Amino acid sequence: MQTETNNYKSLLVSVEQHVATVTLNRPEIRNAFNDEMIAELNDVFTQLGTDDDVRVIVLAAAGKVFCAGADLNWMRAMADYSHEENLADADKLAQMLKTIYQCPKPTIAAIQGDVYAGGMGLVAVCDIAIAVKIANFCLSEVRLGLAPATISPYVVRAMGARAAQRYFLSAEVFDAKKARQLGFIHERVSEEWLKDEVATLCAKIVKNSPDAVKTCKNLLHDIAGAPITDDLIADTVKGIADIRASTQGKEGVQAFLQKRKPDWLTVPE
């Protein structure tokens, strides 16, 4: 059963078979974001992150462009803001990116078109990114006399510091093949296969223990780039001990030994 939420002006939201789809819906301006879209993205990912019926969230976009970054009309208005107002406004964008990045549910960016500037941040904060072969990518901020500051922690994690040095400074456009080589996206597919590829991946995630998936996401955030210290090792020891003793940990092992489905797959829809 599919449920749809129409409470947003710049987003479309639906949930079907444990998969939530959040679609950027400003195709007339290439899904550029403004303060309204930022607030709505922050709200919807906060809500979906606590929805027990949702096990994976797809971030998609309407039209030919995934996201062109910030709305130029909004940016023009920001030029007249005071320093304090600019700080507050930038913080809203930063908090939205953090909300998606820290969302307890796995997130997948389904990239059907070009990604520019702040749109790169939306891709980078998702756990998995799949793009069509014709998609182009660009960190274009320096062309406008700006810097990709709020998105930088996530983009650098996604493509690596060395690659970021080149593309932050040059504002070069690169294609999906290069994005895949850099590790910025995980897969590049033909346009007609994007929906099926994303659906297949969602189905695989939905079959897994929701608690274990959440634990893995937290684990990845905690250990990525961290030095291997005694404290880190102790945290990993505690992590496996806790998950083994958890309800779903016990159920998963028992179900495997008994050659049956675990209960998270047998709960009525």
Regions found by a protein language model. Name each.
Residues 1-62, 98, 195:
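Conserved CoA-thioester-binding segment of acyl-CoA-metabolizing enzymes
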Residues 22, 26, 41, 59, ...:
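Terminal peptide-recognition signature
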Residues 27, 130-135, 185-234, 247, ...:
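C-terminal long alpha-helix characteristic of the crotonase
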Residues 61-98, 115, 227:
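Glycine- (often His-adjacent) and acidic-residue-rich active-site loop
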Residues 68-70, 163-172:
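Short helix- or helix-capping micro-motifs
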Residues 97-144:
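Glycine-rich beta-to-alpha active-site loop
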Residues 118-129, 133-134, 151-152, 176-178, ...:
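Active-site-proximal glycine-rich helix-loop-beta segment
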Residues 153-162:
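Hydrophobic, secondary-structure "cap" segments at the distal end of domains
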